[in-house]
């Protein structure tokens, strides 16, 4: 193959990959239109990895929070839902400020729910906290998407997928009545 053909070949491969990703992305948005779908959203960008040891739920100043980029990203998540004609139903969130802020900025409404707080090192406590979350997903059979705004550990425990901040997994109810991941999306 000549050197002059390489840039053209690279461009063709890139365009094919982009078209495939766009098609997959539209399939996930389409899955959101199905009655009983569930969105499991990891909070928008918040610098760092964990809350400080002295963090308190009643004081956002003691927690890891969204920065300007994270707040803008949360707004873009909500805008992407609106652009795709998706009106969400109930929005439940971890009581951590970065999750509550993501939910408010994206969807304008939020109900704090302690079961979504995640990042607990005690495996048994994590399992017990996830039981009502799994039940809420199982009970969501119809209507607009249920949104769960949470942390990476909860997304992973619930879906088996690792997602970056600002990404979400769409769970769609199958013919057997169980929810399964239809895919994940990330809004820059």
Features from the language model and the residues they span:
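All-alpha RGS (Regulator of G-protein Signaling) helical domain and cognate RGS-like helical scaffolds
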Residues: 116-126, 130-138
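Bacterial N-terminal signal peptides that target proteins for export
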Residues: 1-9
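Generic beta-sheet signal
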Residues: 36-38, 142-150
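Active-site-proximal alpha-helix that buttresses catalytic centers in soluble enzyme cores
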Residues: 25-114, 119-122, 161-179, 184-188
